Amino acid sequence: MEDPIFGGAVVYVCEHNEKGVLGVVINKPTDMTMEVLFDRIDLKLSEGLRSAVVDEPIMFGGPVQDDRGFVLHTPGGRFSSSLTVTDEVAFTTSIDVLEAVASGAGPERMLVSIGYAGWSPGQLEEELLRNGWLTVGADAHVLFDLPILLFFIRVTLSWLALWSLLQLRRYNHAFFDSLH
């Protein structure tokens, strides 16, 4: 996709319903770190946690509400504004998840973004029909364990593997049809 915002982006779709689609770009780090974010919102990390999260980058989640934070994380804890995406992933828009992180009671793994990606009803479907996006399955491993650089590579390789299988299937059908 040749778009200044979404070109090369890997978007994790959190919700898709009759109102549209909500997703988070997961492979475009900003120059902000968790340390800077916590300073800006006046939260102090407990000393034992500083080294674990201080250098983690904040992602550019998308152009919608790019003045707000959004957190993809492993489930657990009671946060005031959370959406269960899968059994392994939750999406929280309230500051209490970051307060829990600061106190040492936060989620095991997380990805923090500024902004999110949103599509109106039918918009993403139209972009998919025009081959504007490649779609692959995702899981907590992709979100929380892969280095940022590998997100795009893994997604691209998954798509290439699927494309190769489809081409092989098409070739095999043509070959076997020619034998009749």
Model-flagged regions — what are they?
Residues M1-H180:
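A short aromatic-anchored loop/beta-hairpin motif
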